[in-house]
Structure formats: C-alpha cells, structure tokens
Regions:
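Substrate-binding groove of N-acetylhexosamine-processing glycoside hydrolases
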Residues: 2, 136, 142, 189-196, ...
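Residues at or immediately flanking beta-strands
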Residues: 21, 225-227, 287-289
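Short, surface-exposed beta-strand/loop micro-motifs that present aromatic residues
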Residues: 29-36
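Feature activates predominantly on carbohydrate-active enzymes
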Residues: 1-8, 12-15, 36-269, 273, ...
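Residues that cap or initiate secondary-structure elements
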Residues: 26-28, 48, 107, 234, ...
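Auxiliary, metal-adjacent structural segments of Zn-dependent hydrolase domains
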Residues: 17-27
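Short, flexible beta-strand-to-coil junctions
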Residues: 25-27, 45-47, 61, 499, ...
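Short loop/turn motifs enriched for small/polar and acidic residues
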Residues: 25, 229-231, 291-293
Length: 578
C-alpha cells in the first residue's frame, strides 16, 4: 500500500500544479517542506505524511484551499513564490495520533470525496457501524487505505455480534433478563436508544462473541480494530449473576444523563477484560475498541487499558459554551475528570475522545461555534495523555459545521490557533473576511447569551433566545452573499439563517399554544423543497418532529423526543444551567 500512496502523492503533486522532490526521512515527526537551491523538497517519515505535504504545498503556495469534500477552491491570486533556500513549513509532531470522524450513515457517492478531503486535512481515522462497513466496497476500502485512513468496524454492536434472528430461539439465555424474563432481541429495528443488552456474565455468550469476532476478522482481513460496544441506551441484564455487578445504591450521574439507572461500568468492563484476553491469545494483532458513555463513562475500580485496547469516551450532551476543562461549567469538568481517569489507567492502551462538533443529530443544524475552543481543547487533550479525537458529522450539513471540522483537523495536528483561523476566513471570504468574522461572532454571542451553559438540543437554544437575534443574523448573511452571489457557501449561510428564523417562529408559536399540524406540515414542506444545499438533512427533521406531531395530537407537552427520562433531564437543565 505504501507504493500506492507514493504514486498517489506524485499524481496529486502534478494535479495541483506543484513541482517538488519527494523524499523519505525516518527521523522526522511529520512532513516538512524545504527549499534547496531553488528546488522544493517535501520530506516525510512515511508515504502518508508525504501525501499530506503535497496538499500542504498546494494550499501554501499553489492557490488552493481544501475546505469541504468534493469542492476544492482555487484562487490564482493566492499563488506565491517560495524562497531560494530554507524551511518553508517545518516538521511538527501532531498533537494527537488519531484524528477523524464517526460515520453514522451508509457509505455512498460522497465517500470518495470524503476520503479525499480527509487526506487533504491530515485526518486518518473513521469509526463506523458494522452494518455500514459491510456495505463498503473493496475499491473504497483501498481508497481509504492508500490515504492512510484506518476504518474501525464497530459502534453500538451487541446486536451485531449476537443477533436475535440467529440466537433468540436457540440461545435465549444470551439476552438480558428484565423483570424476571429474558428479552427477545428486536435486532436493532428500533435503533433509537435500543436499550436491549446481553447477559454479559454468561461464559458461553463470551466465548461465542470471541468466535464471531475471529470469524469476522478472517472474512475481513483488512480490519485491525474491532469493537465491542453495548447497544445504545440502557436495559442491562438483571439475572442473578449480572446483578452481582450492580450496587443498588450507586446510580449514574446528572452530567451524563444516567442518574435514573445503575452504573454499568463494572459489568461492562468485566466482559471487556475477558474478551480482550481471549482475543489477544488468538489474534494479538487486533485492537479491541470500546465506548465510555452515559452510565459507564469512567474506568471501574481495578480496570486497566492494556495493550490492544482502545476506549472512546463520548462527551454526550457536553456544554458547548465552555471548554472541556473549564471549572466554571456545570457539566464539562465531570467529563474532564473522566478523561483523566482513563489516561491514568493506560497500560499500553489508548484513549480517544468521541465528540459532537455538530451538536448531536437532533440539534438539527442549529449553531455550534467551536473555533478557538477547538485549539485549546486539543492542546489540553495532548497534555493529558489523550491519543485521538473523532467527531460525528454529515457532509449534507457541511456549511453549518464544516468550519468546526476544518479547525479540528488543524488543531489536532498542532497548527497555530490565530494563524489557522485567519487563514480559513481569508480563504473562504477574501476581502470580506472581517465582515464574515463579525457574522460568526454574532452567532457565537447568540449561544453565549442563552445562559451560563448551553447543551445542544433545540429547546435549550430556542427558549433562551430572541427572534430579533435570528433576523439580525439573516440580514448579515444576506449582506455577505450579496457581495459574492456565485459562492454556494455564502448562499448556504443565507439558507441556514432563514431556517433558524423559521424554526424559532415554529418554536415560539408552540410555546404560545398557536402551532397547528398544518403549520408543522408547512415547515417540513419548506425543509424538503429547498434546492441542493449543504445545510439541511430533511430526514432528521422528519424523525425529530414525529414527537411534536404526537404531542400536538395528544396535548402532551413537547420537550424533545418524547422519552420521559430524557425530558426529565431537560427540565432540570432549564433550572440549573443558568
């Protein structure tokens, strides 16, 4: 694969109009671009870093900017001459080893552009659901590999390793016992917070999981990271053996939305310890990946991250008005403590941060501005032993959150905060960069004005903001777009702010008890009828607003997604987040 990566680097060098010598130097921490007697040299410790260097040269001197997948920007006025001699871009060790995305949707026609963009921005990792990896073609697997992108086949997957369609009838004892009865697995048909787990203390179940893992990796020899993650939600087994791992007096925590359930860290980590040892005995080349999430956020007593183990700590519903280590925040310092607990038990294993730099799926393209905070957090992660960062994303909403993704990539490689932000604004907006900065400052101020803390779900934003703020943003976006009517990104900002105005109006009408189903239908029709854009994901609105429709019909108060336990936390957020 290294030969193919070198060949791709040479092809991309020519494609972007650059001339340079490519040389491998094992002692470098990353690529370095130099000039020697008028000749450009890209040196790097490996072919993937050489490829990164080719793209860095195209951006630095070739007039290119790689902001979004499939849409290279080229401005000949930004081409520059290089000095006769000296280092142009010095080698710099990336702050984090693993940098990438969590893909929660099938691979599709956008995937080649995504892999291309990731390489252009120095990202090297994708975590995806096993069911989506199963649909990834060999050609796309190679396209990822040649660009240095590792794909983890995993995510929530108890029901993949032990599917109900295979085991419900023959091994009902493999599934959780709830209320004295074994559940019948729905096989993930209800994918939202499935809350169907396994009887994880069953030794035959553990052996079967390992057998299935080994078989899977034999059928997919390219897979080197395989996951064992609970199904989303709760529903842990209550049989006699499993119940030994619960302390009925020890529930979860408010910050991680788990005060209403027992902690599952001990029972989950006992399973992981056993499966990792069995897997290591047969396939020591494999890494076992797993989640820290909701009611199993921190390592249980005595649990260690051994070599070949990798945890991804999900910062679910973190506050986006503060950095993760800000002691003044109500939520985030608890996650910071969890991070430190995980890095303190590393014994050859690795720690990743699972982020939501698009809020969460049902934040519905509402604003999250995490620019300067991104650089500060990546430095904090690096300083405290974190190995990787990944975020959920969608290409379809790139014009809303793409700047977060762009800054995450640069920050995780150790780029300078001020230089990076200035470069992105100048490349995206040219002479209008200062006006664009004012627009994004206004968006950021909208978030800060919501209160001391802000958790990314619609109610938290819309009930604590004013319509005039959204109308002002819309006017600012229109002014920016009027200066470059040919720029689809600026057009998307107009659409984005119009959408926010409409959503705010819908929310206010509901609060005033004036909203009807016809109004909701009109809003959804507007969402679906927009021309091609990278702002809105219509299917997310269809899913989210089923709850609102049900509540309009029943008279129940609409809070979020009609999950009683979740609505309860949101009502408490109303009171405690400031």
């Amino acid at each position: 694969m290294q030969d193919k990566t070198l060949e791709l680097a040479r092809q991309e060098l020519a494609k972007y109009g650059s001339q340079a010598e490519l040389t491998l130097e094992a002692g470098l921490p990353s690529y370095e671009i130099r000039r020697r007697d008028g000749v450009t040299v890209i040196a790097a410790p490996d072919p993937v870093e050489l490829l990164y260097g080719v793209y860095a040269l195209a951006e630095y001197a070739g007039g290119y900017f790689f902001f979004e997948p499939g849409r290279d920007r080229f401005d000949p006025a930004r081409k520059r001459e290089l000095p006769e001699d000296g280092v142009v871009i010095p080698a710099r060790k990336p702050l984090l080893k693993r940098r990438g995305f969590i893909q929660e949707f099938p691979f599709n026609s956008d995937t080649p552009g995504l892999f291309d963009w990731m390489a252009k921005n120095g990202l090297n990792f994708i975590q995806t659901w096993m069911k989506y990896y199963d649909g990834l073609s060999d050609e796309l697997k190679e396209a990822a590999a040649v660009r240095g992108i590792t794909i983890e086949s995993g995510h929530h997957n108890f029901n993949y390793w032990i599917p109900g369609r295979k085991y419900n009838a023959t091994h009902p004892e493999f599934f959780a016992e709830i209320g004295g009865k074994r559940i019948k697995s729905s096989d993930g048909k209800n994918t939202l917070l499935l809350s169907e787990q396994l009887c994880t203390t069953n030794p035959e179940l553990r052996a079967e999981i390992v057998r299935n893992m080994i078989d899977y990796c034999e059928r997919h020899p390219e897979v080197k990271i395989v996951a064992l993650n609970p199904n989303d939600g709760f529903g842990w087994c209550e049989c006699r053996e499993c119940s030994k791992f619960y302390d009925k007096n020890k529930k979860g925590d408010f910050y991680s939305l788990s005060e209403h359930v027992y902690k599952a860290d001990r029972i989950y980590h006992d399973l992981l310890r056993d499966v990792a040892a069995r897997l290591r005995a047969v396939r020591p080349d494999l890494t076992l990946s797993f989640f820290a999430y909701i009611n199993y956020c921190a390592p249980s007593p005595g649990f260690t991250l051994e070599k070949g183990m990798m945890v991804s700590l999900a910062l679910y519903w973190r506050c986006i008005n503060h950095t993760i280590d800000d002691p003044s925040c109500v939520i985030n310092p608890h996650y910071a403590e969890d991070i430190l607990r995980w890095t303190s038990v590393k014994h050859g294993g690795e720690v990743n941060i699972y982020e939501y730099f698009m809020g969460v799926n049902f934040y519905l393209m509402l604003p999250m501005i995490h620019f300067r905070e991104m650089f500060r957090e990546m430095r904090w992660y690096s300083d405290h032993g974190v190995d990787g960062i990944m975020t959920q994303f969608h290409i379809q909403h790139w014009s809303v959150y793409g700047m977060n993704y762009c800054f995450m990539a640069r920050a995780a490689r150790g780029a300078d905060e001020t230089d990076s932000i200035e470069l992105v604004f100048r490349r995206l907006f040219g002479a209008d960069a200062d006006e664009a900065k004012a627009f994004y400052r206004a968006v950021k101020q909208l978030l800060m004005n919501t209160g001391h803390c802000h958790i990314p779900y619609p109610r938290a934003l819309l009930r604590r903001s004013k319509m005039e703020d959204y109308r002002r943003l819309h006017a600012m976006a229109q002014a920016l777009a009027s200066k470059r009517p040919d720029d689809p990104f600026r057009a998307d900002l107009v659409l984005w702010t119009e959408y926010m105005v409409r959503f705010k109006q819908l929310f206010d009408d509901y609060q005033a008890k004036k909203l009807t189903e016809a109004d909701l239908d009109a809003f959804l029709e507007w969402i679906h009828s927009r021309p091609a854009n990278r702002v809105l994901i219509p299917s997310k609105f269809d899913s989210y607003f089923r709850a609102l429709r049900e509540d309009l019909q029943s008279g129940r108060e609409w809070v979020h997604f009609n999950l009683d336990w979740e609505d309860g936390y949101i009502r408490r957020h109303d009171e405690v987040l400031g």
